[in-house]
Regions:
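Ferredoxin-type iron-sulfur electron-transfer modules in oxidoreductases and energy-metabolism complexes
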Residues: 46, 154-157, 205
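Cofactor-cradling patches in redox/metallo enzymes
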Residues: 105-107, 112-115, 121-200
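Short, intrinsically disordered, charge-biased short linear motifs at domain edges
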Residues: 28-33, 47-49, 86-90, 177
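Catalytic cores of enzyme domains
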Residues: 1-7, 15-17, 189-208
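Flanking helices and flexible, charged tails adjoining ferredoxin-like Fe-S electron-transfer domains
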Residues: 3, 20-21, 25-26, 60-132
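Intrinsically disordered, low-complexity segments enriched in small residues
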Residues: 86-93, 97-100, 167-170, 183-184, ...
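Ferredoxin-type iron-sulfur electron-transfer modules and their immediate structural context
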Residues: 1-46
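Iron-sulfur cluster-binding cysteine motifs and their immediate structural context
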Residues: 30, 36-78
């Protein structure tokens, strides 16, 4: 019975920070990685059209199985613009424009001891005035439009605008993205994205 208590195992083992990206991820949720397959399937968000999978739209609802399946590739992101000035210190301002909370949870996971974003020189800030990048989560909502505009205007340059998850980039199942797609410097796929994908995208966003 005691052997099955996960928290006791954790106390004995202790918390270990992963060696990712020098080593492969220790544990990963497959249904947050690249989908590969063929054929036309019914997709509620049109993430699969003419047999082509679009990571920006996918909500990983699994309605495409068994025609499509995850293969473990965590690099489902697009970096349009990077900023090498942020290589030593990269401060992120999280902005929730109307998310369900899943992307928020995964973003904050990268600060946990398992992933430890500070070893990459990545930090959170609670004001856009001190931010190098804004990380937008959730789709477009009327109530948050003014707040988002003010946050973007308050950020000093150079700056990066990051979409975290399908809702921010394309609207997911809720409507439309928080910003027009072309306004994002970085788009991170997932519903929600996993911490490995987030860290990999942030590293590429600063030219690493």
């Amino acid at each position: 019975m005691i052997k099955n208590l996960w928290f006791l195992r954790g106390l004995r083992k202790g918390i270990r920070t992963e060696k990712f990206p020098e080593e492969n991820p220790v544990e990963i949720a497959l249904w947050s990685t690249e989908l590969i397959g063929e054929g036309n399937v019914e997709c509620p968000v049109d993430a699969i059209v003419d047999g082509q999978w679009n990571f920006e739209k996918c909500i990983f609802c699994r309605k495409c199985t068994p025609s499509f399946a995850p293969k473990g590739n965590i690099n489902i992101f697009r970096v349009r613009n990077n900023e090498p000035a942020f290589r030593k210190s990269f401060h992120l301002f999280p902005f929730d424009s109307g998310a369900c909370g899943a992307c928020n949870a995964e973003l904050h996971n990268i600060a946990s001891p398992q992933y430890d974003m500070t070893r990459f020189g990545i930090f959170f800030t609670n004001t856009p005035r001190h931010a190098d990048a804004i990380v937008i989560m959730g789709g477009w909502t009327q109530g948050m439009k003014k707040a988002l505009d003010l946050a973007l205007d308050a950020m000093p340059g150079p700056k990066l605008v990051i979409a975290l998850g399908s809702c921010a980039s394309t609207g997911g199942i809720m409507g439309k993205g928080a910003l027009e797609n072309e306004k994002y410097d970085v788009i991170i796929g997932g519903c929600p994205p996993n911490p490995y994908t987030i860290l990999s995208a942030l590293e590429k966003a600063r030219g690493d």
